[in-house]
Amino acid sequence: MGEIIDGKKLAKEIQEKVTREVAELVKEGKQPGLAVVLVGDNQASRTYVRNKQKRTEEAGMKSVLIELPENVTEEKLLSVVEELNEDKTIHGILVQLPLPEHISEEKVIDTISFDKDVDGFHPVNVGNLFIGKDSFVPCTPAGIIELIKSTGTQIEGKRAVVIGRSNIVGKPVAQLLLNENATVTIAHSRTKDLPQVAKEADILVVATGLAKFVKKDYIKPGAIVIDVGMDRDENNKLCGDVDFDDVVQEAGFITPVPGGVGPMTITMLLANTLKAAKRIWKMN
């Protein structure tokens, strides 16, 4: 029976550490600031942004929310981002995705100053991650590495399989595992004999967006299984990309959904914002 990796508990520990560090900085008259830009009225995005704001404030950071209408022009959005780039009280900038179709996400991400890009999506940060240089790492992949390390497992020398090749999770988490000296395979919808490939993994990260996709025949006994999915099953109940009840028997460690990867994402955003502030102050 697999041991449950408690993402809530780990996220709380990391957030407490960030909060303590912010309190020390505030005593010196320095307060890290995070600005979130929300375009339109997507309810899921709105809920997510509210959570980010709440957690930012709990950590003692300055929190700014800029709301723009669905029909805002690309030019206007880019000028808002440029103003935030210049704002000395803001150290992290996040434009909530997805954006309306008439706006180029790529252009917006490229406009965010890479030293304030706490989402880790700017090409400079992506490039730094791939050459192993210190950079802002996308929040979910950064959280996944912390979850794996929390099991006490040494990543070096392990076989890792990542199912999913998105730019937001799959590719960066594969690169982070490689940077930790794991032997990494990226699998995806075109991979032949996927269960066999997955079964070789000491560490299996699943980010397919398909409810309960991974069954126990994908699992090497004792493997660490990280489920990035956030899906609904046939009864409309929240579940992951891994069939938890089936897989928990085989796994050594497994993240639940909810309560696994999810709580880590906002926590790593706060850690990135603190890192950005410290870097900017050091440069100045």
UniProtKB/Swiss-Prot annotation:
Gene3D superfamilies in the cross-refs: Leucine Dehydrogenase, chain A, domain 1 (3.40.50.10860), NAD(P)-binding Rossmann-like Domain (3.40.50.720)
Keyword Phosphoprotein among record annotations: no
Coiled coil: none
EC number: 1.5.1.5, 3.5.4.9
SUPFAM superfamilies in UniProt: Aminoacid dehydrogenase-like, N-terminal domain, NAD(P)-binding Rossmann-fold domains
InterPro entries documented for this protein: Aminoacid_DH-like_N_sf (IPR046346), NAD(P)-bd_dom_sf (IPR036291), THF_DH/CycHdrlase (IPR000672), THF_DH/CycHdrlase_cat_dom (IPR020630), THF_DH/CycHdrlase_CS (IPR020867), THF_DH/CycHdrlase_NAD-bd_dom (IPR020631)
GO molecular function: methenyltetrahydrofolate cyclohydrolase activity; methylenetetrahydrofolate dehydrogenase (NADP+) activity
Biochemical pathway: One-carbon metabolism; tetrahydrofolate interconversion
Superkingdom of the organism of origin: Bacteria
Record keywords, A-Z: Amino-acid biosynthesis, Histidine biosynthesis, Hydrolase, Methionine biosynthesis, Multifunctional enzyme, NADP, One-carbon metabolism, Oxidoreductase, Purine biosynthesis
GO biological process, one term: purine nucleotide biosynthetic process
Ranges that cross the membrane: none
GO cellular component terms, semicolon-separated: cytosol
Binding site for NADP(+): 164-166, 189
Reactions it catalyzes: (6R)-5,10-methylene-5,6,7,8-tetrahydrofolate + NADP(+) = (6R)-5,10-methenyltetrahydrofolate + NADPH; (6R)-5,10-methenyltetrahydrofolate + H2O = (6R)-10-formyltetrahydrofolate + H(+)
HAMAP family assigned to the protein according to its UniProt record, in alphabetical order: THF_DHG_CYH
Protein family according to the UniProt entry: Belongs to the tetrahydrofolate dehydrogenase/cyclohydrolase family.
Functional description taken from the UniProt entry: Catalyzes the oxidation of 5,10-methylenetetrahydrofolate to 5,10-methenyltetrahydrofolate and then the hydrolysis of 5,10-methenyltetrahydrofolate to 10-formyltetrahydrofolate.
NCBIfam families: PRK10792.1 (NF008058), PRK14170.1 (NF010767), PRK14186.1 (NF010783), PRK14188.1 (NF010785)
Subunit structure: Homodimer.
Protein name listed in UniProt: Bifunctional protein FolD
Organism: Listeria monocytogenes serovar 1/2a (strain ATCC BAA-679 / EGD-e)
UniProt lineage: Bacteria, Bacillati, Bacillota, Bacilli, Bacillales
